[in-house]
Amino acid sequence: MTKRYSVLAVMVFLASAPAFTQTEHSAPAGKPGGYVLERDKEVAKNEPGTHKGGGETIGYSFFAKTPNLKLVFRKRAFKPGSAIGYHVQREDEIYYVLSGRGMMTIDGKEFEVGPGDAVLTRPGSSHGLKQVGKEDLVILINYEQAPKP
C-alpha cells in the first residue's frame, strides 16, 4: 500500500512541474544511479481517445524510451467529448484526476470522477472513461509493464 502512495506522490509532483523543452539525463545510459527529466512539451502528442474512445486528446508518454523501466507513467488531456473506450484491463492500473470531470464506467457501474480522485482498476475488470462538462479532463495513468531492453 505504501508503494502505491509513493508512486502517486511522484506522479502528482511530476504532473504539476512546469513545461519546458529539453530532456535531461544525469548519467550516461546503462550506468547505475542518476535520473531522467522529461517535460510536457517534449512528449506531448495529439491522439484520438485510446481504446477506440474517440475525440481529441493530448497524450504525454513520459520515459517511454527509457531502457529497463517497468513503470509506465502517462498524462492525458481529454478535450470535450473525448474518451478512453471500454476495455478489459490486463494489469493493475491507476488513474488520478488532476482537473476537469469525467464519467468512469467499471464493470458496468458508472460514477463521476474529479480533481483529487484516484481509481485503481484491477486485472480482469472492464472500464472506460469519458470527459464531461466544458473543461478538459486531465489525468495521470500509471501501471507496470515488462521492461524494455
Question: What is each residue range found by the language model?
Answer:
Residues 63, 83-89, 130-132:
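Short histidine-centered beta-strand/loop micro-motifs
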Residues 20-70, 149:
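A short, N-terminal "cap"/entry segment at the start of jelly-roll beta-barrel domains
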Residues 67-68, 123-148:
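Ligand-binding loop in jelly-roll beta-barrel domains
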Residues 72-89, 123:
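Conserved short histidine dyad/triad with adjacent acidic residue
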Residues 109-124:
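Short acidic-glycine-tyrosine-enriched beta hairpin
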Residues 1-7:
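Bacterial N-terminal signal peptides that target proteins for export
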